[in-house]
């Protein structure tokens, strides 16, 4: 029998951009200076007015794909947890716990690659469309109220994103 993982939702928290900037500063403090990275706040916590799980998503875009492993290893050496489940050969996913709770999810990808552009453009397009924010919020709230599993919640979100953001430039 599969254990049903639950999830919590929060209204937009104005401290999330500050939390992102602080975490970005921490990450930059230990990454080798020779590695060219672009670190951006992604996901619903980057969109004012969006309901989201209270976990800040961060994309680290690496200019040279050969540096993906170095960045991953640097994060690991500084307490970030590698997720083999969400990772692939060109997209590493890591988490950071604060007070025992995952507060940050880090996506290490090729800068300006397809995945990086999808994540960055999702935020950009959502920020500029209040009716779409409402529709996305309604979906998440409905799933939460129906006590959907975290797996089903994630699946429904990905489907919504695919339907509404099929063109990534």
Spans of model-derived segments:
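Short amphipathic alpha-helices in soluble, non-transmembrane regions
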Residues: 70-78
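Short, flexible turn/loop "capping" segments at secondary-structure junctions
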Residues: 1-4, 49-53, 116
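Short loop/hinge segments at the start of secondary-structure elements
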Residues: 66-68, 83-84
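Active-site nucleotide-donor binding segment shared across nucleotidyl transfer reactions
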Residues: 27-66
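Conserved catalytic core of two-metal-ion nucleotidyltransferases
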Residues: 80-114
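Helical scaffold of the NTase/Pol beta-like nucleotidyltransferase catalytic core
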Residues: 1-40, 161, 168
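Short histidine-centered catalytic/ligand-binding loop motif
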Residues: 8-15, 60, 121-125
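Catalytic cores of NTP-dependent nucleotidyl/adenyl transfer enzymes across multiple folds
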Residues: 114-169
């Amino acid at each position: 029998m599969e254990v049903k993982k639950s999830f919590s939702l929060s209204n937009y928290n104005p401290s999330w951009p500050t939390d992102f900037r602080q975490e970005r500063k921490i990450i930059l403090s230990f990454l080798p200076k020779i590695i060219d990275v672009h670190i951006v706040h992604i996901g619903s916590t980057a969109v004012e007015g969006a309901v989201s799980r209270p976990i800040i998503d961060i994309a680290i875009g690496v200019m040279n794909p050969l540096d993906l492993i170095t960045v991953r290893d640097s994060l690991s050496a500084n307490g970030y947890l590698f997720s083999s489940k969400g990772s692939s050969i060109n997209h590493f996913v890591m988490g950071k716990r604060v007070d025992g709770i995952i507060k940050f999810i880090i996506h290490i990808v090729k800068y300006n690659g397809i995945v990086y552009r999808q994540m960055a453009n999702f935020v950009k397009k959502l920020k500029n469309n209040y009716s779409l924010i409402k529709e996305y919020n309604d979906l998440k709230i409905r799933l939460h109220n129906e006590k959907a599993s975290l797996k089903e919640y994630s699946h429904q979100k990905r489907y919504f994103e695919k339907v509404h953001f099929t063109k990534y430039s």
